[in-house]
Amino acid sequence: MAYQSEYALENEMMNQLEQLGYERVTIRDNKQLLDNFRTILNERHADKLEGNPLTDKEFQRLLTMIDGKSIFESARILRDKLPLRRDDESEIYLSFLDTKSWCKNKFQVTNQVSVEDTYKARYDVTILINGLPLVQVELKRRGIDINEAFNQVKRYRKQNYTGLFRYIQMFIISNGVETRYFSNNDSELLKSHMFYWSDKQNNRINTLQSFAESFMRPCQLAKMISRYMIINETDRILMAMRPYQVYAVEALIQQATETGNNGYVWHTTGSGKTLTSFKASQILSQQDDIKKVIFLVDRKDLDSQTEEEFNKFAKGAVDKTFNTSQLVRQLNDKSLPLIVTTIQKMAKAIQGNAPLLEQYKTNKVVFIIDECHRSQFGDMHRLVKQHFKNAQYFGFTGTPRFPENSSQDGRTTADIFGRCLHTYLIRDAIHDGNVLGFSVDYINTFKNKALKAEDNSMVEAIDTEEVWLADKRVELVTRHIINNHDKYTRNRQYSSIFTVQSIHALIKYYETFKRLNKKLEQPLTIAGIFTFKPNEDDRDGEVPYHSREKLEIMISDYNKKFETNFSTDTTNEYFNHISKNVKKGVKDSKIDILIVVNMFLTGFDSKVLNTLYVDKNLMYHDLIQAYSRTNRVEKESKPFGKIVNYRDLKKETDDALRVFSQTNDTDTILMRSYEEYKKEFMDAYRELKMIVPTPHMVDDIQDEEELKRFVEAYRLLAKIILRLKAFDEFEFTIDEIGMDEQENEDYKSKYLAVYDQVKRATAEKNKVSILNDIDFEIEMMRNDTINVNYIMNILRQIDLEDKAEQRRNQEQIRRILDHADDPTLRLKRDLIREFIDNVVPSLNKDDDIDQEYVNFESIKKEAEFKGFAGERSIDEQALKTISNDYQYSGVVNPHHLKKMIGDLPLKEKRKARKAIESFVAETTEKYGV
């Protein structure tokens, strides 16, 4: 194929959109944009305006109401009706988007709109709906990394998207052969929220031409914005649904409204089933002939996480009470078309209040059941069916039941629900980057290979549980976890779950960890949780304790660590606190290893959980559900979910993946072999050496194209190193891979120096560079043990009496600072150097190093503020006020900033504003840790 420029790609797209039904208009600046919006507003509201178009004053009043809002607020205004007072004091309501009759909106397309705010910018392709720029398309020529278009959008959004451009709902980026879409937001745009579009069979639609044909037809695009974008009230963000979610909702709605049949949706764990099922419920609840939509979840899933998720999509959606009489009242309340409740509560309501629910013997009702593979629904289904005679049932599951893994009564998911309406399998989700693949290790803990994981029953003359829980084996497994945990979790950047076969096993492992933990320099934070039975079987006197006593000890340990006050009388609160802890950490601390039997292995989502240790038998849906706790997408430093099996579950893993990915080829789901990654590394290393034979030669590169080649080559190498480190056989030596750790650190330092240089140049001046939009993937480079806290710990250990030892400590810190990859530490690098060179030598043994460093930073910060204010001729106290506000809110107060800058010429004002914003952000990061 001949070379195609960005201009040619843009022109081709404009022609295609015109053929699809968009009116091609010429809009070159903000004034023309406003004039076009006003014209269409008058046309669409001609009846209401009664022949009197909006006057200048009226239009200005409208702009005052809709301009200057956040992206989130703009999205709400877009979907609402806005009252406008006319000059004659009458009032009319204006709408900006027809969210029900999608094709009745007016569709236009323009290109090369120029705007000038902080910097001048020219946008590629802008799609206008009813005159508002709702979709922005940014293009790169073929061969350019699509991430550069993403970074350009981020830059434009920060510097240029103001006025009506705050109404952009969605961005589309493409290099002609790869195309993605993502929602606009006030918060940081994340690469993980860039989605591919696909067809109903989950085949990607990559090329820009095919994408436009499928996704950007006028009615389809308006439908996508109106129906399949969600305003998340809790997080105040816009969410775009993924293609498989859209197709599943449409298939379910069609089945519910055009037939009387049931059905189920099979979407893999971690693919966003909650949003899909809730959106389907919401749309069905708006159908006139459906009297009630009842969303059913299992009681154990209606925890704080589920409530939080549901209420994001519609405030107050979750019925939190377990009072069945209230559920009956809600069922009879015609103003509540949608109810979210538990399976157990619904069963009780039917059993005790059948006469009060008489109307539902004839009224059409739709039940939507989350995690419908569970046996509880099969048991309850018969009871509900007897009462709700005109009901349809739709299930959502990530792991359906087939003949191989049927429920206890032998039924499959298809037996209960009928046909599968849509599938999105684990292989699809991994391919699209919506979940991660798995790296699975099998650790042999027996010399006697005859005892296999499938021997989970009592075999004649052999008590297998006794063997599994032998003191020697339990300690062996515990030591293996302790010795490898930092490697698996990237120096405890991530959390883990350890699942074991029984409560007895959990207690034994907890006590072993507790004993061995005392010998560690940096003890692991261990927690345990299980449900005890009030009247417990003592297993013929073998166990000399009640499990509640042991749980009380675990909770007491937890209370001491996290300053809480739980007990076995408040296990629900303990559960919720652990749930929050494993997701986000508590008070700058978090659980490293959570030991469970079955809890947290289904329905629990945590992006910062990356490792599962397994010492129990798992198969089919239980295995996939447990493994899937680790594979939520987070950032570049988490390339896969790590599974460490202490039983031979190889066959069970292969069988489960075969069933739930519908393929015998598991290579797309499991990590490749060490040898394959090693070969890939060797190739990448050779490529890097061809560009820059030694690290110091990076300093000699003058050409930006060559510098870009270095960045891309080292970035690839770093990604492969990240994967190699997951393997036990990996050694960072010249003998093993041809490169040692020191050489890698030297290349990394040069890479980070280029990153700092580009970041600094971008902040200081509007310099166009091919490096501006390159994706450095800095998170992948970080070594989370070498950070500010790490350095402060070394500082505290300096022997202030022994000058020779002091010099050795100082030299150690200097070496670490030279190779610092933590962003905050790099900012503090010069400060710490000055402190150890000029302050530490003058201290004596009675001085508090922590306090001395705080005092030193305070003096330096004061000097920086005084110097910057003096250089810019601005008020120092006002600058500090802005900085304090920023430290609290993360936003530079525009009112204070405007007041401080004063009446400078426009160009100088922009320059001053940019300089102050950069100074405040950098000093906050520099002195705020």
From Swiss-Prot:
Catalysis: reaction(s): Endonucleolytic cleavage of DNA to give random double-stranded fragments with terminal 5'-phosphates, ATP is simultaneously hydrolyzed
A single Gene Ontology MF term assigned here is: type I site-specific deoxyribonuclease activity
Please provide the Gene Ontology terms (biological process) for this protein.
DNA restriction-modification system
EC nos: 3.1.21.3
Q: Which InterPro entries did the record assign?
A: Helicase_ATP-bd, HsdR_RecA-like_helicase_dom_2, P-loop_NTPase, Restrct_endonuc_type1_HsdR_N, Restrct_endonuc_typeI_HsdR, SWI2_SNF2, Type-I_R_enzyme_R_subunit, TypeI_RM_Rsu_C
Ranges for the Helicase ATP-binding domain?
254-418
Keyword annotations for this protein, in alphabetical order, are:
ATP-binding, DNA-binding, Endonuclease, Hydrolase, Nuclease, Nucleotide-binding, Restriction system
| Binding positions (ATP) | 268-274
Q: How does it assemble?
A: The type I restriction/modification system is composed of three polypeptides R, M and S.
- Please tell me what else the database record remarks about this protein: Type I restriction and modification enzymes are complex, multifunctional systems which require ATP, S-adenosyl methionine and magnesium as cofactors and, in addition to their endonucleolytic and methylase activities, are potent DNA-dependent ATPases.
Q: What does this protein do?
A: The restriction (R) subunit of a type I restriction enzyme that recognizes an undetermined sequence and cleaves a random distance away. Subunit R is required for both nuclease and ATPase activities, but not for modification. After locating a non-methylated recognition site, the enzyme complex serves as a molecular motor that translocates DNA in an ATP-dependent manner until a collision occurs that triggers cleavage.
User: Which family is this sequence assigned to?
Assistant: Belongs to the HsdR family.
Matches recorded under NCBIfam families? hsdR (TIGR00348)
Protein name, UniProt field = Type I restriction enzyme SauCOLORF180P endonuclease subunit
